[in-house]
Structures are given as C-alpha cells and as structure tokens.
Amino acid sequence: MRKKNKFLCEICFEYQDMFYLLRDKLSCTNAAKHTIQLEPGVTPINTRPYRLPESQKEEIDRQVKQLVVDGIVTPSESPWNSPLLIVPKRAGLEGQPKWTMVVDFRKLKKKTIGDAHPLPDITEIMDQLGQSKYFTCLDMAMGYHQIELEHGDGPKTAFSTKQGHWEYLRLPFGLKTAPATFQKMMNSVLSRLTGTCCFVYLDDIVLYARSLAEHDAKLREILDRLRTYKLKLQPEKCQFLRKEVTYLGHQITNAGVRLDPQKVAKIERFPTPTNPRELKAFWGMVSYY
C-alpha cells in the first residue's frame, strides 16, 4: 500500500498539468478537428426553442456562461438553430443533483453525411483483459469539447437561450459523426499502444499489465502521449493502479471479467415496459450487453 501511494503521488506531481480541475480553462487538442459534412443542397434549419421551466433556463444560462469562459461556445449570428434540453445526471461527490445541457441536433443529424469508422468491439476488449494483474482507467475531461470544429462549421451548431444566440467552437455532444471523429483521434494518439498495453473506447482508456514495472512504464508512456496532444483527464473519474476496475459496464480482475453488479441490479429493477417509449429505453439498456 505504501509503495502504491508513493507511486500515485509521483504520478500526480509529475503529470499535474494533465488533470482538468475546477475553474481550469479546458485546453484544445492539436490531434484532430471535426467537420460537419452536409448532404448536397441543404439549407439552414431553424427550429423553435423548446419551452422550459424558469429554473431550467437559469441553469442553462449558468452553463452557457461557463462554456463561453472556457472558449467552447461564442455569440452567433447563424441562421441555424437547434433547440435545447436539460437532463439530470448522476449527483456529484457532494450529493447535489447535477444537470447537463443538451442541444437537440436530430434535424441536423438527418442532413449530415455519416462516417463509417467503427467503434471498438467491447466483447473483444474484454476477452483480452482478464489475464492481467494491474489496471488503470483514464477518463478524458469533457472529451468532445477538447476538439475544435473546422472553421465554418460552428454556425451549423447554433442554439438559443433567453440571453442570446450561440454557436460551438468545439465539438458538441450529439452530432452524427462525433463518435467517429473522437475514436479516430484516440486511435491515432495511442497508436502502437492499443492492443498491446491499453484499449480505448471513445473517452475511456484502460491500461492493463502483468507486473508493477510494466504498469508504471506503460502508464507514463500513455500520459506522455496525451500530454503531447494537449489532452486533459478528469481526475475524479480515473482509477489508478487497481487489481479490480470497472470499465465499460464490466468488472475486470486477474480472475476474469464479469458484468458490473450495479448495472445488473439496475436492469433487474427496471419496471415492466408498458408502452413503446419504455420498451425502447429498456432495450437500449440491455442491448449494450
């Protein structure tokens, strides 16, 4: 335990610039840019904003203000507009409820040309992890927002609040080809490491090793790669030097891989669907496995 704590202290000190902390300004990677390629003949789509409770509007204004400070969105004069939603997410360490602002890009997605780049096969990843002894999981800080949009594509992402009209400078969540762009970037950043000492699925990285020496050397190599490309990590979501980790809904140890019991319990507690919407939600949850 003492050796582990010493190692973690060394890593946190040596790579302190890698961790995104409260009130930090999120950096922008030099590894990729995102392009929104539209079908021929598409004209700007302008959808009326959804009606939202006043309390949610205040939360949206707070989040947009922070996005402006971080250089993620900017005031816009775009003819495009997609409506906003705000959805709950898991409470933070303080136990306070949190909300995520989401732009509904469904109409834009229908007019966007797709990208056939595949995501990794989760089953194949799990098949190769069970024989290792030491693991570290790394989570990218607001992953998509670390990628710039190509010049001229920002207006397509425009949205409105009671404070004004805005557009993204960085890659937002919900665009059709965002996962492909992010996965291609991470595959490039960690080239020749994926499949030998780590796997990456979008913004989630798992390092696996059979010895402490191998683990420590490979972790530094991965962190050096991320630093080179100006990519930041979310410290509270990282799991360092563990013999058991939770990754992509699975618990991984040197004894093998099993489904995360918390995810299984959630499925078991899910009420019997009574309409198509509930059935779709249930199917989306179980089909992951």
Annotate the PLM regions.
Residues 1-289:
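Retroelement reverse transcriptase polymerase core
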